[in-house]
Curated annotation (Swiss-Prot):
Official protein name in the record: Aspartate carbamoyltransferase catalytic subunit
Membrane-crossing segments per the record: none
Keywords: Pyrimidine biosynthesis, Transferase
Keyword Amino-acid biosynthesis: no
Amino acid sequence: MTNSLYKKHIISIPELSRAELELIVKTAGQLKAEPNPELIKNKVVASCFFEPSTRTRLSFETAIQRIGGDVIGFDDGGNTSLAKKGETLSDSVQVISNYVDAFVMRHPQEGAARLASEFSNGVPVINAGDGANQHPTQTLLDLFTISETQDRLDNLNVAFVGDLKYGRTVHSLTQALAKFNNIRFFFVAPDALAMPDYILEDLDEAGISYSLHTDMETVIPELDILYMTRVQKERFDESEYAHIKSAYILTAALLEGARENLKVLHPLPRVDEITTDVDKTPHAYYFQQAGNGVYAREALLALVLNESL
């Protein structure tokens, strides 16, 4: 039976069904348990990073090689014809589509991945981040990590802490978890960085429970997942940043009343919003989360490039 992800563009989380998300999570678990080095043998994947990336690019390229594919591409968009000779993104994509079986693309411009998908001649485009818009494969590894640690994706209490206004990871993960049953969200942020209205309106329309908070200490005892994010210094003046930052620092002491199954996640890099003493607690899972990016991306690539997987 053909899987619904075969040759599908992976541009945004809302375009993926619950069944597709579950298939990716299940396949990631299988590949973590039993590696398969020939899943995309003889397939060539373009890794096109028009802005700097460390974890995402290395994770994708590792995933491609571990399941038997070959990688071509670049990690510095400034040295491409697009930048140096004025070539349009659409022209670049049309040319590269002649060489490869799939695109992985990160670009600073919102909507760039969708534009690429319109000019790729049917070659599937996987969005590795387009500006502040979407980062769907981060969400896939987050879902896999939550499933791995909680043994479920339904019936969860999940808190997001920090920059909820600009953080594309929290927007995408909220949209993904909203497809599951009995999810209760806790959004913890200063008013200036609160979750955007469009996300809250979607939750209201779907009848999904959420609450807004400015203090995380009071919600920690209720949580299964605590998802921390960095408060971005560049968005505040010095005194305002110092005040906001100090309110959203997770320490080991704050976790003393947490549920035994609570896991702390973070898309990384962290600055000082999680103190290093948290690393030694059984709740810390952000480094394993980053490692899971390889398996989630292996699963996605395998499904996009195999008709009957």
